[in-house]
């Protein structure tokens, strides 16, 4: 991440984003510089307009909070059905003659609906 930040600093200060300048920024920040990562970053940013990329990223709409995709809701419904089937199976085989709901954990159903 610090490599990208170095490129952003260079862009903001109107310096050329090249291997030498990125290495200088990283060394000034005390980062152990890997030349292969510097070369890869410079190659990746060669045809990129950084200002345009920043504006595009800043203008992108934020995802709606609390919303979920329809597929996720359906999967949750399937899980609820499976849980209900498991509970029904558990109720039939757990009849030890003890009507103490607390001991069986059945009293918790009222708390969680």
Curated annotation (Swiss-Prot):
This is Large ribosomal subunit protein P1. NCBIfam families: ribo_P1_arch (TIGR03685). GO terms for molecular function: structural constituent of ribosome. Residues 56-113 are annotated as: Disordered. Residues 74-105 have a biased composition (Acidic residues). Part of the 50S ribosomal subunit. Homodimer, it forms part of the ribosomal stalk which helps the ribosome interact with GTP-bound translation factors. Forms a heptameric uL10/P0(P1)2(P1)2(P1)2 complex, where uL10/P0 forms an elongated spine to which the P1 dimers bind in a sequential fashion. The keyword Nucleotide-binding does not apply. Forms part of the ribosomal stalk, playing a central role in the interaction of the ribosome with GTP-bound translation factors. It comes from Haloferax volcanii (strain ATCC 29605 / DSM 3757 / JCM 8879 / NBRC 14742 / NCIMB 2012 / VKM B-1768 / DS2) (Halobacterium volcanii). HAMAP family: Ribosomal_L12_arch (MF_01478). Belongs to the eukaryotic ribosomal protein P1/P2 family. Keywords: Ribonucleoprotein, Ribosomal protein. InterPro entries: P1/P2_N_sf (IPR038716), Ribosomal_P1/P2 (IPR027534), Ribosomal_P1_arc (IPR022295). The keyword Ribonucleoprotein applies. GO terms for biological process: translational elongation. One of its GO terms (cellular component) is ribosome. Residues 56-66 have a biased composition (Low complexity). Transmembrane segments: none annotated.
């Amino acid at each position: 991440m610090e490599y990208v930040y170095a490129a952003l600093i260079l862009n903001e200060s109107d310096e050329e984003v090249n291997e030498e300048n990125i290495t200088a920024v990283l060394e000034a920040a005390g980062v152990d510089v890997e030349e292969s990562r510097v070369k890869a970053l410079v190659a990746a940013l060669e045809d990129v307009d950084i200002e345009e990329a920043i504006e595009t990223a800043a203008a992108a709409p934020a995802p709606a909070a609390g919303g979920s995709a329809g597929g996720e809701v359906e999967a949750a419904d399937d899980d609820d059905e499976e849980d209900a089937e498991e509970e029904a199976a558990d109720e039939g085989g757990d009849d030890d003659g003890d009507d103490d709901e607390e001991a069986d954990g059945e009293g918790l159903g009222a708390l969680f609906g």
